[in-house]
Amino acid sequence: KQIMFKVKDIKTNEIVQVLDTHCDEYGKAWFLLWKDKWVWRAADNYCPPNVVPKKRIIVAGGRNFKDYHVMREALDKRVNDFKELVCGGARGADSLGATWARTHFIPIKYMEADWQAHGQAAGFIRNHQMGDYADELIAFWDGKSTGTKDMIDYMQKLGKPVDVIYF
């Protein structure tokens, strides 16, 4: 890789050569150095203009969604946006999303419904917990699933980005 630029490491005060960059959700930059070593936060509130902060993104949808090819095609376009994939743990779109994340070495945050404690409301409670935690939603929806509709509606109510892929 070519050197992108040089920066002072705020922990060691050394000038370091930057090969790649990553910004956290607060817009604070982390810089990747030689031999895959990350330096400590090199600058407060600084992200190079070509770097977009990564996000915690929910990948959710109906339990009857089974088309991994469609999911892979949609998520591969966004692979660099993911800090973490948030997963509700249900079969279908949720589990396919987790499979995709594992193949791309993206951390997964499982937030499964507690059916024992909450009964029929468990899925909706879990959806709201995921919505509060995450930055964005990518939903695979058949236009019928009430759980997916609830997830979409809640994220929109929070003013967070929602991308719906209809199948």
What are these regions (language model features)?
Residues 52-57, 64-167:
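Acidic/glycine-enriched connector segments
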Residues 43-51:
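Flexible loop/turn and low-complexity linker elements, especially glycine-anchored beta turns
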Residues 12-14, 61-66:
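Short polar catalytic/cofactor-binding loops
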Residues 1-3, 51-54:
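Short, Lys/Arg-enriched N-terminal segments with co-localized hydrophobic residues
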Residues 5-6, 10-44:
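Basic/aromatic-rich interaction segments and small domains that mediate binding to polyanionic partners
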Residues 8-9, 25, 50-52, 77-78:
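Generic structural signal for beta-strand residues in well-ordered domains
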